[in-house]
Amino acid sequence: MSVSPRTRAILLALVCLAAGVGLFGADWLGAPLAADEASGTWTGNLTLQGNYYWETSTRVVAPEVRLSLTSPDGVQISADYLVDAITSASIAAGVIEDIRFTEVRNQGSVSIGREFDLGEAQLRLGASGLISHEPDYLATSLGVNATLSLNQRSTIVYGALGYIHDDVGAVLRGMNAAAVDPMGRMLSNRGRVGELEGVNASVSVQQVILPNLWISGAYDLIYTQGYLANPYRSVMVQGILTPEQHPSVRVRHALSGRLAYYFEPTHTAVHLMYRSYFDDWEIGAMNPEVRLYQELGENVTLRARYRFYTQTRSFFWRPVDMFTADDPFVTADPKMGGFTNHLLGFRLVVQLGFLAGTPLSFLERGYFDLSFDYLWQGNRYGEAVLAQSGLHVPF
């Protein structure tokens, strides 16, 4: 898909905004906080990460690289690149016969920010942008954010605003999907099906209560309009196969909170988390989670977690054989129904300080992490496995 004039304008606006934050902010906000003014050197962090997801009909392998840099005068720049290799046999992904296919999604993002010293407070301003592309869609987004630190950073207030724009297409796989018409156009590529636009806003507050106790709370709002269905899904309506049809506007709200406590005698931390969600499609959800962190010596930390999720159904959801011609909206999306999920997992973090004095001493300030989660889904997606591993190296 070609990049629309609107998308080009959005990305240009992001570049201009980022340049303003990074280069001219000091003129009106005061002195920036520098990473290493004394030595005049840049500092940064490099992350190499592998992501894996598996369920009955879909497998995703996604290598990722992230780079963050901080200049001597306090400008922070980050970039992220991810490649998704998605193997699926799901009709919802465009399969029209019993085959598996693999397609690739490329995603890149950049962000820039700067923190300014306001005396007894610090203010960080930032901007970010993202572009994601695969054969049947192009997604772009941009955002701005601000973080205010008070009371010697024991109180942190954060706010963000973002814009998203997606061009949605359809590419069919299987049978004679590779056929072309007399003009040479691939018949499997149905072209642009629709577009989606949206804005999102979030605000959060984090407060240190005691040296070993802190709490946080957040509110998120997402407004989207446009094509909100899946171009590959169809519903049998009184014997007629009908394309999925969802409302064209959706407003989502989420409230979340976290309480964290560190037990110094046993080097153990407990995090209690809760998230509630509701939208104007009448879906409501609650999502409690508990995490336990345990230090195992000087170099190893183990995290275990359990997460519960349950939601109600949307106002237009029906069993697949219960839709009628009078229904304005029809869906085959399992996420529109009511269901319950359980997730159980662990994460292991190994600090690499033991590499000091060896040929790999350049890694001694970094760490390696490995995580594994098992998800029991109460809908037709069934059970799923999520795994990650990464190497994080500061420099």
Please state what every model-predicted region is.
Residues G25-T43, G74, D117-L123, N151-T155, ...:
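Short loop/turn motifs that connect adjacent beta-strands in outer-membrane beta-barrel proteins
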Residues L69-S71, R114-F116, L148-L150, Q207, ...:
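Residue-level signature of outer-membrane beta-barrel architecture
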Residues T58-P63, D80, S90-I96, Y137-N145, ...:
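Outer-membrane beta-barrel translocator domains and adjoining extracellular loop/strand segments
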